[in-house]
Design a protein with these regions (language model features):
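C-terminal motif of bacterial Sec signal peptides marking the signal peptidase cleavage site
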Residues: 15-18
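Acidic/polar, low-complexity intrinsically disordered N-terminal segments immediately downstream
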Residues: 20-100, 106
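Beta-strand-rich structural segments
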Residues: 64-77, 189-212
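Short acidic/polar inter-strand loop motif in beta-rich domains
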Residues: 78, 129, 140-148, 267, ...
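Short amphipathic beta-strand segments in non-cytosolic proteins
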Residues: 89-104, 219-246
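Aromatic sugar-binding surface patches on proteins
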Residues: 110-123, 132, 249-259
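Short, surface-exposed loop/turn segments at beta-strand-coil junctions that are enriched for proline
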Residues: 123-130, 261-267, 307
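Surface-exposed beta-loop interaction hotspot
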Residues: 127-194
């Protein structure tokens, strides 16, 4: 019995030491401070037909994943802002074979009368590279005329893993996208988790004159539920989870809100099961709750990895 007790204690110490060493080495390897961005700065500006168009985003940068945007239009002859116009916004990715696709976005921008800008969002699905370029196609009405133009922009890689995204085909055959919006910098605590969920609208008519928005249409998924099961997948963590998590549901702004409880820093996997408005499973698998020390944790077929 005495030998057995010493044996158990030795095993516990070995697992604890291994966990601590792995975690320490892991943190030393990444050595990355996560920066939170709160200030909107200009990403790009350009002039067309006596108007100046300026587009702002957090940190003045477009990243792969979710980007909130603010657009202003100024008449360069009168120096007056163009207010409450109908402004459309369409991002298009062109590859080396001239194939063109888009990504989730708000096509009709919404005018903010208090701060006098047009608001929207874009979820870039890839970064700019020598083989692929992103262009923004924008139109608006000013001086009783419709003005249209395009602007080449650069999309950078998102180094903050707390803002990762994923795309997938659901069990219903539709193409979906989930993009994390917040928190940018989680704490060891219960954190409000915010995500956007979008679906590609398959065209029902032949393409018209390019860029035909009906061929590049996306919708905010409505009244779905994103079941949440966070785990620490590192082998030393033994499939560790946490209590008090809250599944994500849609709120008035169209985004999905829940709660994720991070009990320690490190590598986490947000395992999801997505249900439609009728409770039908669209994507995701249940993750076993077994304690598995020394084995990498299982993941849902629908998941996003984060790190803090």
């Amino acid at each position: 019995m005495k030998f057995f007790k010493h044996f158990v204690i030795a095993i516990v110490l070995a697992v604890t030491t291994s966990c601590t060493l792995d975690k320490t080495d892991f943190e030393a390897e990444i050595n990355r401070d996560v920066t939170e961005y709160f200030e909107f700065k200009e990403v790009t500006s350009f002039n067309s037909d006596n108007y100046k168009i300026s587009i702002e985003a957090l940190n003045g940068t477009f990243y792969k994943g979710y980007n909130e945007i603010r657009l202003t239009i100024t008449n360069t002859q009168t120096n007056e802002a163009l207010n409450n116009s109908e402004v459309t916004f369409l991002p298009i990715l062109t590859d080396s074979d001239n194939n063109k696709i888009s990504c989730p976005h708000r096509y009709h921008l919404v005018y903010n009368s208090e701060e006098q800008f047009y608001s929207g969002y874009v979820v870039f699905t890839s970064i700019s590279n020598p083989m692929e370029n992103w262009d923004l196609y924008i139109s608006f009405t000013g001086s009783n005329q419709t003005h249209t133009f395009s602007q080449l922009v650069t999309v950078q890689n998102q180094t903050n893993m707390n803002l990762n995204m994923t795309s997938f085909t659901g069990n219903d055959g539709e193409q979906y996208f989930i993009a994390l919006v917040a928190p940018q910098k989680p704490k060891v605590a219960e954190n409000e988790l915010v995500a956007g969920i979008y679906k590609y609208n398959q065209p029902t008519e032949p393409a018209g004159t390019f860029p035909d928005p009906s061929q590049f249409s996306y919708a905010e998924v409505e009244n779905y539920t994103l079941l949440l099961d966070p785990r620490m997948p590192e082998p030393s963590m033994g499939n560790h989870s946490s209590p008090n998590n809250v599944d994500l549901t849609q709120q008035a702004d169209g985004l999905y809100y829940g709660v994720v409880n991070y009990t320690m820093t490190g590598n986490w996997t947000l395992n999801f099961m997505m249900l439609n408005q009728n409770g039908v499973l669209i994507k995701g698998t249940e993750v076993p709750t077994d304690f598995t020390p020394g084995i990498e944790g299982a993941k849902s077929e629908l998941h996003i990895n984060i790190l803090f």
